[in-house]
């Protein structure tokens, strides 16, 4: 009895893995055994960096808020403390956006926080 290959499924599996390696250089993009390792590692980096991105953006927002706060004569920590005491609930993402786009509104927030 002849060996059953199930070539359709095998080809689909290989094609799916090779498709994920599109744009990879050299053997990493066209040799299946190397591609498997490259794609696995790429997915590990992607998983890790989706989480790191959240930390990176939060630190970016804090830097922007701190820079704008110092232009208004206060510091980031004093501003956040003042906002908490005066029950001003604006998250860091929105606060950083206001600091960059609308300096007058940010100054008003700083004044309200320093009451």
UniProtKB/Swiss-Prot annotation:
PROSITE patterns: RIBOSOMAL_L20. Keywords: Ribonucleoprotein, Ribosomal protein, RNA-binding, rRNA-binding. Coiled coil: none annotated. Pfam families: Ribosomal_L20 (PF00453). GO terms for biological process: ribosomal large subunit assembly; translation. The keyword Transmembrane does not apply. One of its GO terms (cellular component) is ribonucleoprotein complex. Gene3D superfamilies: 6.10.160.10, Ribosomal protein L20. One of its GO terms (molecular function) is rRNA binding. InterPro entries: Ribosomal_bL20, RIBOSOMAL_L20_CS, Ribosomal_protein_bL20_C. Binds directly to 23S ribosomal RNA and is necessary for the in vitro assembly process of the 50S ribosomal subunit. It is not involved in the protein synthesizing functions of that subunit. PANTHER family: 39S RIBOSOMAL PROTEIN L20 (PTHR10986). NCBIfam families: rplT_bact (TIGR01032). Belongs to the bacterial ribosomal protein bL20 family. This is Large ribosomal subunit protein bL20. It comes from Chlorobium chlorochromatii (strain CaD3).
